[in-house]
Curated annotation (Swiss-Prot):
Any coiled-coil regions, as ranges: none
Pfam families named among the record's database cross-references: ASFV_p27, BIR
Keywords, alphabetical: Activation of host NF-kappa-B by virus, Host cytoplasm, Host-virus interaction, Inhibition of host caspases by virus, Late protein, Metal-binding, Modulation of host cell apoptosis by virus, Virion, Zinc, Zinc-finger
Domain of life: Viruses
Name recorded for this polypeptide: Inhibitor of apoptosis protein
Residue ranges covered by zinc fingers (C4-type): 189-207
Amino acid sequence: MFPKINTIDPYISLRLFEVKPKYVGYSSVDARNQSFAIHDIKNYEKFSNAGLFYTSPTEITCYCCGMKFCNWLYEKHPLQVHGFWSRNCGFMRATLGIIGLKKMIDSYNDYYNNEVFVKHKNRVYTHKKLEDMGFSKPFMQFILANAFIPPYRKYIHKIILNDRYFTFKFAAHLLSFHKVNLDNQTTYCMTCGIEPIKKDENFCNACKTLNYKHYKTLNFSVKL
């Protein structure tokens, strides 16, 4: 289960709580249960207890902070995922408290760093795919070692514009958008992938005008 990029509130960390729920009609567990039940969804209690209600077959939403999640149907830990991506959600803080929420986020970090990372790292075809794209082995090793670990995960999520799934497709997109060659320490334009740029830049001069709307939101570079 992963958040939809356009529903991540960049300013939510500046607020202590979402004072008023965005979807008041789903404030009760019964209302959230009903949203799943009428669509014949099984084992939905874990989602409604996590403050989430059914929106569509590909999407569920938090009634309080309004964050939407996709690829959710087989998620085993919806409460942890919700807390991880929306840690200032009023529902999450009221349910777990600040200390409890921090402990849960730490444990979920461990889960991703161990189970999820190891599972994807063992996929040999991914190494081959990245190698076919023309990237050096040192850079592939760097990406495969850090793609699922903060702080690099937040960079990856900002880059992805089309694919929402948290798999090695993220690493592949990261490589294609922001090509960094560790052999000569050269960084290339995120748009054309051809023109070399400064370490603190993302686009070459020719592509900056094409990316004006996104330039500020994508104003970051992977720290090696």
